[in-house]
Structure formats: structure tokens, C-alpha cells
Amino acid sequence: MSNITISSHPVVNEQIAILRDRSLKPSQVRSVVDEISRFLAYESTKTLKSPSVSIVPVLRSGMSMMSAFSKVLPDVPIYHIGIFREKSTLQPIEYYNKLPKKSTDTAVILDPVMATGGTANAVITTLQEWGCKNIIFVSVLASEQALTRFSNIPGVEFVIGAVDKSLDAKGYLVPGVGDIGDRLYGATA
């Protein structure tokens, strides 16, 4: 899995342990995700060479990583793709796409949790069809299953905060962090 980098930074590990606490308030969840994202932003951009780069947060939870990435890449365009996972089939449904006609050479995708990999696959496919040649997918937490699915894909790199070994019947990571979008924004299912 040469295209996958998993953070070994102790601060990232500590913050992910805090994020697993389901009693955190939404403001605390956002703060922890932002802190982890700062480290992942530096890690994911340290070898960036292309002058043509965009940031693509996956709506809505990917927005929680934007502050950190826009500080590291302050003048790159930010495009949005909205995808949700249908609850019964776990299939990704795209509901919003604000990519311009001309692609950037490199896109940095932000999505804090990669569970089944369905959303990741949908976004990667969309960006490849758009013409993007290099993709860096950044996630706070991912499943082993999803990372295995994406190992050694040419032109796609993954930078991950930590890896959980399994998924539950609803497609959530175990032990995971719950529905990160709901936790970030105080929504209830």
C-alpha cells in the first residue's frame, strides 16, 4: 500500500482518542477535527509539486477540515462536491457538484471519515472524469477495508489520521466516531 500514509504523530493519535468520546459537544468535535486536520494538511502537502492545485471538501463533513487546509494552501481554489450515503444501501448519492469546466492537475479531497469507501470512490471517479491527474484523499479516520480497496491506485494518494479495523452492519467504523457529520453540526438522525 505504497500510496497510503497513516499518521504516526502522537498528537494526532491523542486527538483521535478524544474524538471517539461521543459526549463531546459539536464545538468540541469541530475543534478536535480541526486540530487533526492541521497535522494532516502538512503531511499531505509536503511533497506537493504541482502549481495547479484545488481543495475539494466533500459536503458537509469535509468542510470541518477546510480551515486547516486553507491555511496551508491559502490561495488555491476550493471546489465542492456533495455526496451522502444512502442509509439502507450504503451507496453514495451525489447531490451537488461545483467543479469548473477546467480541472486542476492535483486535487486534495477532504472527508474526515472513510468507512466503506463508497463516497471516496465516487469522488475520486468524479475528479478523474473531470481530468484531474493527481488526487490526494485526506481523512481523519478510515477503515482497513476501504484502504485495502484503494491500495496502489495510480495517481491517488491517501493521507489518513488513523485506521479502524472493522465496520458495523450500518457501515460505521468500529470503534469509530459515530456519524461525524451529525456530531460536527449538532444534527440528530
UniProtKB/Swiss-Prot annotation:
Allosterically activated by GTP. It catalyses: UMP + diphosphate = 5-phospho-alpha-D-ribose 1-diphosphate + uracil. Pathway: Pyrimidine metabolism; UMP biosynthesis via salvage pathway; UMP from uracil: step 1/1. 5-phospho-alpha-D-ribose 1-diphosphate binds at R60, R85, D111, P112, V113, M114, A115, T116, G117, G118, T119, D179. CDD domains: PRTases_typeI. Its main location: cytoplasm. One of its GO terms (biological process) is pyrimidine nucleobase metabolic process. Pfam families: UPRTase. Binds 1 Mg(2+) ion per subunit. The magnesium is bound as Mg-PRPP. D-ribose 5-phosphate binds at Y172. Its cofactor is Mg(2+). GO terms for cellular component: cytosol; nucleus. Uracil binds at L173, G178, D179, I180. Its EC number is 2.4.2.9. One of its GO terms (molecular function) is GTP binding. Keywords: Allosteric enzyme, Cytoplasm, Glycosyltransferase, GTP-binding, Nucleotide-binding, Nucleus, Transferase. InterPro entries: PRibTrfase_dom, PRTase-like, UPRTase/APRTase. It is found in: Cytoplasm; Nucleus. Catalyzes the conversion of uracil and 5-phospho-alpha-D-ribose 1-diphosphate (PRPP) to UMP and diphosphate. Belongs to the UPRTase family. NCBIfam families: PRK00129.1. This is Putative uracil phosphoribosyltransferase urg2.
